[in-house]
């Protein structure tokens, strides 16, 4: 009997230890997600990684370079945005990592990337059963780096995250630099009081690196079947930028959306409405205190209604309230926001920017009034 109890105890300890080892990943950087742990000198030839498992926690395939901040490529100095190391994916090269997740849960991946050659570059990101292509030829940040987000729904308890460079460049070493890969579990948006808009304050969204001052790009809907911004769709050719209070001016709460691509940068949400009933849509329009100056206009659409809210930006923060009252013409109403104009930062970097929207509310009203 004593031996049976001891065997049972050992079995329970073994099971519990496996549970701990396979616990779902927590929000934040993946293991060695910033690539600060690198290959041994014997596993490299110059900057090229020669062994598949040489970068701790990652598997590599193809021409992958381990880049140190300040390393030179021809006459260009390669800059690493966070920490001192990153990886560069050559033609058809990839890196991947397996992690434990909760099946059925929506997750968002955030990563930083930069192109290192003049050619347009794309990056394929995938999990076990989903994939998307992220274009990185347009630069939104003044530092040469941008952070991107991509969402997926976990199909099982373990998934493999893979970054793949599908490009065929003239120079085999050309390819995107990747740094700081993080994950965040997303929760389904809920209604707040009488507000019919879900996640109208944009507080639920992709992981934001605490030290990254350039925000996180959310790709167009055509690039992503699951939105990293719960409740919202990015229905445009360009991305929108997710900004945080720590580095930008945010009208309300801790997060907001910057429309950085003019009319090519739009977000929308479909809400339930009652036919022939009147509704009031209100929202904040401002600037992110990121040097985006000049006259701005945000266009808001709901049903057959439209309003254009102007805002004179000095690039130092601030906002005003916009309002649209409309009559519902169907049981479902699409609410859409876009920027009328294209804007660039005043630092002459050529970086795109735009107006910020926040605190979106939609409530039923008794009758049509201003």
Curated annotation (Swiss-Prot):
InterPro entries: DGR2-like_dom, Galactose-bd-like_sf, Pectin_Meth_Modulator. Keywords: Cell wall, Glycoprotein, Secreted, Signal. It comes from the Eukaryota. GO terms for cellular component: extracellular region; plant-type cell wall. Expressed at low levels in roots, seedlings and leaves. Induction: Induced by L-galactono-1,4-lactone (L-GalL), the terminal precursor for ascorbic acid (AsA) biosynthesis in the Smirnoff-Wheeler pathway. Residues 1-22 form the signal peptide. The keyword S-adenosyl-L-methionine does not apply. This is Protein DUF642 L-GALACTONO-1,4-LACTONE-RESPONSIVE GENE 1. The gene is DGR1.
């Amino acid at each position: 009997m004593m031996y049976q109890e001891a065997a049972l105890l050992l079995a329970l300890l073994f099971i519990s230890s496996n549970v701990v080892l396979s616990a779902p990943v927590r929000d934040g950087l993946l293991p060695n997600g910033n690539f600060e742990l690198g290959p041994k000198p014997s596993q490299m030839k110059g900057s090229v990684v020669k062994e598949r498992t040489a970068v701790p926690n990652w598997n590599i395939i193809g021409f992958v370079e381990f880049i140190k901040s300040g390393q030179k490529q021809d006459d260009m100095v390669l800059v690493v945005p966070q920490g001192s190391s990153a990886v560069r994916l050559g033609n058809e090269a990839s890196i991947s990592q397996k992690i434990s997740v909760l099946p059925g849960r929506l997750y968002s991946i955030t990563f930083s990337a930069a192109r290192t050659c003049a050619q347009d570059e794309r990056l394929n990101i995938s999990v076990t059963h989903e994939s998307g292509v992220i274009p990185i030829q347009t630069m939104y940040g003044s530092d040469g780096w941008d952070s991107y987000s991509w969402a997926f729904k976990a199909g099982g308890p373990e998934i493999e995250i893979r970054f793949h460079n599908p490009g065929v460049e003239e120079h085999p070493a050309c390819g995107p630099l990747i740094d700081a890969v993080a994950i965040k579990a997303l929760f389904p948006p809920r209604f707040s009081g009488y507000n019919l808009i879900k996640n109208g304050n944009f507080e639920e969204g992709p992981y934001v690196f605490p030290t990254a001052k350039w925000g996180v790009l959310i790709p167009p809907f055509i690039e992503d079947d699951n939105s990293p911004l719960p409740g919202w769709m990015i229905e445009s050719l360009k991305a929108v930028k997710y900004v945080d209070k720590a580095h930008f001016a945010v009208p309300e709460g801790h997060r907001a959306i910057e429309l950085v691509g003019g009319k090519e940068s739009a977000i929308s949400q479909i809400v339930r409405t009652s036919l022939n009933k009147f509704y009031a849509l209100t929202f904040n329009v401002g600037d992110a205190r990121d040097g985006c100056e000049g006259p701005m206009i945000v266009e808001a659409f709901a049903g057959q209604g439209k309003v254009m809210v102007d805002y004179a930006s000095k690039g130092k923060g601030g906002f005003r309230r916009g309002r649209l009252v409309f009559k519902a013409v169907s049981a479902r109403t699409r609410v859409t926001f876009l920027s009328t104009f294209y804007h660039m930062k005043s630092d002459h970097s050529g970086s795109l920017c735009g107006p910020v929207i926040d605190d979106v509310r939609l409530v039923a009203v008794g009758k049509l009034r201003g």
